[in-house]
């Protein structure tokens, strides 16, 4: 991670199309700092070019990259670099300069046969800025089942099928009473034998198009998005680290008011210092669950130890484990 050691080796940067001589085919790796600086340079150039267009051409709901998408990505990159000032500036640009609006989970349309679950990963969603990634790509590993047998009367055995991957108890238990995200963002596991949903088991599916049984629907449908909710969280975190706690709390209040039942929503007030920063970390986990951001957040949060259990086996990812670094 950038905030762990920006002088560590990252990926090699090849910035032109010239062929290399044979004695230079093994390219040297650039530092993490150099890679991030190049990313920022590229985003700055993209922003500059978009700003030469008229306002109506800077964003169009047509699945293409746009100025607000660039601005949200810049906010995210600056957040990873702990450039709190610019992270907040670009989060605010996304929030204030465009007409995107947070989806109120209290007012979602009633389920239909065509859309039994609300599809947050659609241009119909007022939060969506840019869509990417297919359902088939995202679920290639986690859309698997495991089977087990139970012995019944007279020595008969019955085979059952369960989802191989489910949401952790720790995540599910982090949602407070009245927090609508648990039910709206994550599908419950479906009992294929009894044709009912398990009440205490949640899958890793959600936010994109799902079938009536909570299964991924339409392999080519979009699975991920850049959306407004992240901008509020980026703003809150950047402001909290920049000693602007009132702005951080205001951003959290605006976001969470759309996520809780009105009579159970308690405004986040009085939080300061580390308590506020921890609160924001927890909200990122809940709001952005299964969107591909958690891994990057854990890396910049100090790469904490994680323990997973599978049956009787225990798997431990130690703090600062080399496995926290993606192989190049």
Residue ranges of each PLM-predicted region?
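Acidic/polar-rich alpha-helix caps and helix-coil junctions
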Residues: 1-147, 158, 169-328
């Amino acid at each position: 991670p950038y905030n762990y050691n920006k002088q560590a080796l990252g990926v090699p940067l090849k910035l032109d199309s010239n062929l290399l001589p044979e004695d230079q085919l093994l390219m040297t790796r650039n530092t993490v700092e150099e890679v991030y600086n190049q990313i920022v340079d590229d985003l700055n150039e993209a922003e500059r070019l978009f700003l030469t267009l008229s306002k109506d051409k800077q964003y169009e709901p047509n699945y293409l990259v746009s100025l607000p998408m660039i601005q949200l990505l810049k906010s995210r990159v600056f957040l990873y670099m702990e450039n709190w000032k610019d992270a907040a500036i670009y989060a605010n640009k996304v929030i204030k300069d465009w007409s995107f609006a947070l989806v109120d989970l209290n007012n979602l349309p009633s389920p239909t046969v065509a859309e039994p679950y609300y599809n947050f990963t659609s241009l119909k969603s007022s939060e969506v800025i840019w869509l990417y990634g297919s359902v088939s790509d995202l679920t290639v590993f986690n859309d698997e089942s495991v089977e087990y047998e139970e012995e019944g009367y007279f020595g008969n055995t019955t085979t059952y099928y369960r989802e191989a991957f489910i949401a952790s108890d720790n995540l599910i238990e982090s949602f407070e009473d009245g927090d609508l995200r648990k039910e709206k963002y994550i599908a419950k596991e479906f009992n294929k034998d009894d044709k009912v949903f398990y009440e205490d088991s949640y899958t890793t599916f959600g936010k994109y198009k799902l079938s009536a049984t909570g299964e991924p629907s339409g392999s080519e449908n979009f699975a991920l998005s850049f959306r407004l909710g992240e901008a509020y969280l980026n703003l809150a975190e950047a402001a909290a680290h920049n000693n602007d706690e009132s702005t951080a709390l205001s951003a959290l209040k605006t976001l969470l008011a759309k996520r809780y039942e009105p009579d159970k929503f308690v405004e986040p007030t009085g939080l300061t210092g580390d308590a506020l920063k921890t609160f924001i970390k927890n909200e990122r986990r809940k709001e952005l669950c299964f969107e591909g951001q958690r891994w990057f957040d854990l890396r910049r949060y100090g790469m904490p130890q994680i323990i997973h259990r599978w049956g009787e086996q225990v798997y431990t990812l130690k703090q600062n484990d080399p496995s926290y670094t993606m192989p190049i």
